[in-house]
Amino acid sequence: MNKILEKIQNNTTILIEASAGTGKTHILENVVINLIKTKLYSINEILVLTFTKKATEEMHTRILKVIENAYSNSKTNEILKEAYEQSKKLFISTINKFALHALNNFQIETENYSKYKPKEKFSKEIDEIVYDFLRKSDSLIQALDIKDYELKVFKSDAKKTEEIVLKIKKAYERDTTQELGDWLKTQTAFENILLKKEELIKDYNKIIEDLDKMTKDEILSFYNKHIQTGKLEIEYSKENDIFKIAETLLKNKFFSTLIEKETKKNSKLSPKELKIKNDLICLGINIKHEKYKSEDNRNKNRNNLKQYVILKVEYKILKYIEKELKKTIKSTNTIDQNYIISNLKNYLKSEDKKLLNAIKNRYKIILIDEAQDLSLIQIEIFKILKTAGIKLIFIADPKQIIYSFRKADISFYNKEIKNKINTDARIVLKINHRSSKKLIGPLNKIFNNIYNNAIADEIEKIDFTNSLPNQKNDNNKIVINGQEIEGINIITTNTESEEDIYQKTALTIKYLLAYGKIAENNKIRNIKMQDIKVLCRGKNEINLIDKALKKEQIQTNKTQEKFLKTKEFSEIFYIIKCLDRKQSFKTLNYILSSKILNVPWNLQRILIKQDKICLIEEFIENIIVLLEKNEITLINAINKITFEKNLWIKIANITKDQKIIEWAKNKINYKGLLIKEGKLENLKTYETTLEIISKIYHKEQNIQSLISTLESLIINEEPEEIEEKINNINNDNESIELMTIHKSKGLGMNIVFLLNTTPIENSNFFSKKNQFYKFYQDGKIEYDFFKLEENKKYARLKILSEEKNIFYVGATRAKFALFIIKINSITSKLLEIAKIFTIDDIKHDFNIHEFIGQKRFNKKKYNTNVNTKLIPPKPIIKNMFKKEYTSSFSSLTAQAHHKEFYENYDFKNINYEKETELDYEPGLEETLPKGKDIGNILHAAMEEIIFSTAKDTFDNFKKNNIEIIEKQIQKINSNLNTIEIQNSLAKMIYNILTYNIRAINTRLCDIEELQKEMEFLIKINPEFQKQKYLFDKHFEDLHIKLSDGYLKGIVDLIFKANNKIYILDYKTNYLGKNKEDYNITNLENTIKKEYYDLQYKIYALGIKKILFKNKKEYNQKFGGIIYLFTRAFEDNIECLKSKFENGIYFNLPKFNDVDLDKIILELGIKRHL
């Protein structure tokens, strides 16, 4: 710390470079406290800036805590006392919030006496400006210096008005208007084409005239002199449109061949042919005829002249938007994030320097956290502040530049920050306090290869320095079933299927939760959901992994999108604006082209051309009147606008267009359209949004107040809060947290799954959505709005550089373990650059099943009783579930462990319950013979016998129930119908019903609420068979083959005791002649051998789906499972009452273990006794 303070005293600007995990926030806190303690600066003179609201709040809390602790430890220190008393005056803020604070709190200096109200972006204002421009384009284009033909070309690039608006909005949000303007100035060749277009049109038509003088055979011969002889349908005609001519020269095979190809050997052109060829080449050069390959590497012609005009008009519209927004800012004092920063810069640069001097007098030193993310305009602001004598401390990690969409760039950082700070004013932090030694070693090697071996311009280069581990983390690790795993693990599949890799990732998380433990600071505990974070490249990955995890019954923190951010809200909001008389139907064009009205583009054009928009306006006027008189609700008003069939039929008839008339007759409302398309989530959002808006309207009582309230709701959302909600994320300890890699920045996480399945060609600069290439060349950042092939390689390097940083940020969040999901994507490319296979201590094909061994039996658990109710389920309608679509537990065990049987049996048609094969000892005489018949007789009798009859003496019980027993013996096996067997069964059943079971402290005959032979069906996950091959190396013994269908089961008895629900199953297995043969050890061995532990989990799953809504209910209301081995109850039951109950096995499965896929997978593990 002394070294840092010394550098601060001796330099005007300091740079602290801190790699991930090296404690830059800790350093920043200590710098602040030491600046105060050493009297270098008072607390009022220090300004701390960062990027997000969340980081600001965390930093504020931590710094105040440090000040408080320092004061507590030295209360005699007057400086610390003063700092503690004034600690709330320490200004810690985001850069944008500080800029807004400066504009709003130095009003005399800025001469702006109204406070600005911030909002994230001018989305709706831009919509209105663009729609207004399109409506008034005829009168505006002259003022904007847009020619008629240029506007026509611009509009031709979109099918709908909505597309034009969206395109302009995206262009504004990219914030590259200045760059586009600068680029357009360099395109003088295209401007010259437009200036002499009439002359070029004449040249083209003259060529056509010359061709018309040739016969068809002569033209074909002319063509064949350039290629191998072939047939071609040659078509051309005169044109008066320079853009069509440019298109023709590109796409017409005849013309493009004559321009591009040389004549074949031994072929000689006639003077006439030579003239036409030369004229075409000259014309092609004059209109910049070029052929390019598109981003997807298919041959595709590009008409750059047309694209130039589109971009030219786009630029002029963007400048018009800027002008109109300035009016909006002036009239409403509402300002977006871009204008906040640009306004601050303009005031600081003003000649009077009033604002600059005011800030200088207030703050003497500024600490800027995450300085690598500064945009050029933000860097310029700090350079201006530096000129006023304010000291700057930049804290940065250039490897974490991941906000290119905020205009951060490594060249800005290197050129404008790092290279302008003296070497002796720089500090590099090296000790990683976050990650374990098992992670730091291989990560150093990975990023050394990625960064230090990269080919890049010096100004674009990022230097990687190895991190050093903190010894206190050396023994931190993840253990699965007693086996330690590597710090870095690669998850891959044998296929390149996205679905497979997501499913395998979800299953890995599932079993990590079931079998994994964390060892930290010599303590070991189970892995919890909050330990695991899944970091995704974007929203698409979040949606896919969320879907895969929920298939495995694992909850995530992904929530539904807030209604203010939905498309449904936007469209309803525009309709509401149409109901405001003051708006003068400004938003009508938008709603006409929106999906909520679904008006065909041809009809919109006819309405505009024939000036019939007034019909819709008149209709809405009538609705406004009804609304004002309270004769119609707001929802009904909106519904009338979106679906008034008579209105649309009337309008359609005016057009006399049969297709439009048919559309009007068959028009369905928005709800019907969503139902037809199966978009039920959108329907739910639409109805919820209507309900919320309706409630606000009911409170406000008029449309103007409603609009004002809704706009306030939008405006008052903090930019960072909106950004955090984009991925629909919230925190919950009972769920797996999913977030983007961008949102994970600055956080430490125990276990990280890193997901980026985006192919590199689909990334930012190569997508069709992005309108330009950005790259570094000749000492400066360049933009190419044509996206030319020759610039693609430079743009690729630029995007790859950012992807390296995103990968770095994601990988360095982990404390204990990192799981990298590898598929044919950017991640694969980066791992290749990292030379991953040359690095030790990395598990290259991580498979969770290598670590899953035999699972221990759960220990007996007792829970506090809570009130619950046993509700018998409705009977299963058996004909709904065909036999070929059901399986049983017995069929699963047969499939899993009897290969020969499996290979010769069609399990689609299985419908039997397997009985345990028992060794028979001929020398022993038993009253009740072994085999399945006795079991079936007992089960059938127990179903009919009324349990309460056992409260009486045995003789009376036998008298009341012997006929039932005799009937069942006769029915199942008449050879067993003897007096001895009847009496033995009666005695056994009586003993079972009158025995006080310790687990429930009651007798079965005393139970009042019970359900016998309860049937259940569990839906089989059809994806299981696919999941199996994801781990195929570990399934050699698993022969289960399940079709999409159901697993059926029948539970012998479900009952309520002590306010809990219990399951009881009768087992007639023969374990020996003596009662001691049914001790707990033998019972556990039998349970294990026969896989009964998996059977009772299936029973638990069956009733869980029927009786319990969630984990909380399961834990509170489920008492457990009792397996009652009936042969232990043949004689006197008094002998059972030993320290351990003979013949009774009890267990309470954990909620997470009651999972069908997990049970089936455990069946595949061969057990050894």
Swiss-Prot record:
Residues 1-436 form the UvrD-like helicase ATP-binding domain. Its EC number is 3.1.11.5, 5.6.2.4. GO terms for molecular function: 3'-5' DNA helicase activity; ATP binding; ATP hydrolysis activity; DNA binding; exodeoxyribonuclease V activity; magnesium ion binding. The keyword DNA damage applies. InterPro entries: DNA_helicase_UvrD-like_C (IPR014017), DNA_helicase_UvrD/REP (IPR000212), P-loop_NTPase (IPR027417), PDDEXK-like_dom_sf (IPR011604), PDDEXK_AddAB-type (IPR038726), RecB (IPR004586), Restrct_endonuc-II-like (IPR011335), UvrD-like_ATP-bd (IPR014016). Keywords: ATP-binding, DNA damage, DNA repair, DNA-binding, Exonuclease, Helicase, Hydrolase, Isomerase, Magnesium, Metal-binding, Nuclease, Nucleotide-binding. GO terms for cellular component: cytosol; exodeoxyribonuclease V complex. Its cofactor is Mg(2+). It catalyses: Exonucleolytic cleavage (in the presence of ATP) in either 5'- to 3'- or 3'- to 5'-direction to yield 5'-phosphooligonucleotides; Couples ATP hydrolysis with the unwinding of duplex DNA by translocating in the 3'-5' direction; ATP + H2O = ADP + phosphate + H(+). Coiled coil: none annotated. Binds 1 Mg(2+) ion per subunit. GO terms for biological process: double-strand break repair via homologous recombination. Pfam families: AAA_19, PDDEXK_1, UvrD-helicase, UvrD_C. Mg(2+) binds at H939, D1052, D1065. A helicase/nuclease that prepares dsDNA breaks (DSB) for recombinational DNA repair. Binds to DSBs and unwinds DNA via a highly rapid and processive ATP-dependent bidirectional helicase activity. Unwinds dsDNA until it encounters a Chi (crossover hotspot instigator) sequence from the 3' direction. Cuts ssDNA a few nucleotides 3' to the Chi site. The properties and activities of the enzyme are changed at Chi. The Chi-altered holoenzyme produces a long 3'-ssDNA overhang and facilitates RecA-binding to the ssDNA for homologous DNA recombination and repair. The N-terminal DNA-binding domain is a ssDNA-dependent ATPase and has ATP-dependent 3'-5' helicase function. This domain interacts with RecC. This is RecBCD enzyme subunit RecB. It comes from Borreliella burgdorferi (strain ATCC 35210 / DSM 4680 / CIP 102532 / B31). The gene is recB.
